[in-house]
């Protein structure tokens, strides 16, 4: 019998100074993902395709891809406890002025890793993504 692992849900909202289609591509295109995270990413932007990010630390599968407004992934890290099921990551992208409101719900995260992942999303995704778009002349963003 598999052991029960307590899980948590992480919710975050971020405003990014780029249109939803560009944010969507940055999150689903391996080349763009690697560019803004400055780490290796693999995979294709197709439903059912497997992907890796952060030099293989993150791995998963695209479950739903609705360009340019919704991304749903099965998602795990190499530090997931043995026997833990993949989490479910959902990102919704909504136009907000000339930018995008990104709404993330990351459910089924092992509770012991929730605080680290909550901060990790900010430090390793949202900040670099905002900086990457700013370097492309997109301006500043808010969290």
Protein language model features and the residues they cover:
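Hydrophobic ligand-binding cavity/cleft-lining segments
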Residues: 1-42
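A conserved amphipathic terminal alpha-helix motif
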Residues: 5, 108-143
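Alpha-helical scaffold segments that form or flank carboxylate-/histidine-based iron centers
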Residues: 11, 18, 49-54, 116
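Generic anion/oxyanion-binding catalytic loop in active/binding sites
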Residues: 11-12, 22, 51, 106, ...
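Tryptophan-centric aromatic hotspots in well-structured domains and transmembrane helices
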Residues: 27, 74-75, 121, 126
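Hydrophobic-ligand binding "helix-grip"
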Residues: 34-42, 52, 56-108
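Short, hydrophobic secondary-structure boundary micro-motifs
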Residues: 35-36, 45, 140-142
């Amino acid at each position: 019998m598999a052991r029960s692992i307590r899980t948590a849900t992480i919710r975050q909202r971020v405003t990014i100074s780029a249109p939803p289609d560009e944010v969507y591509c940055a999150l689903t295109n391996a080349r763009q993902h690697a560019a803004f995270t400055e780490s290796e990413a693999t995979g294709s932007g197709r439903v059912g395709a497997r992907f890796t990010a952060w030099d293989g630390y993150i791995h998963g599968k695209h479950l739903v891809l609705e360009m340019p407004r919704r991304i749903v992934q099965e998602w795990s890290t190499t530090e997931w406890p043995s026997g833990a099921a993949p989490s479910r990551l959902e990102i919704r992208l909504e136009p907000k002025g000339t930018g995008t409101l990104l709404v993330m719900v990351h459910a089924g995260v092992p509770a012991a890793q929730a605080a680290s992942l909550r901060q990790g999303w900010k430090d390793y995704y949202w900040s670099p993504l905002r900086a990457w778009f700013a370097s492309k002349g997109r301006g500043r963003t808010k969290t």
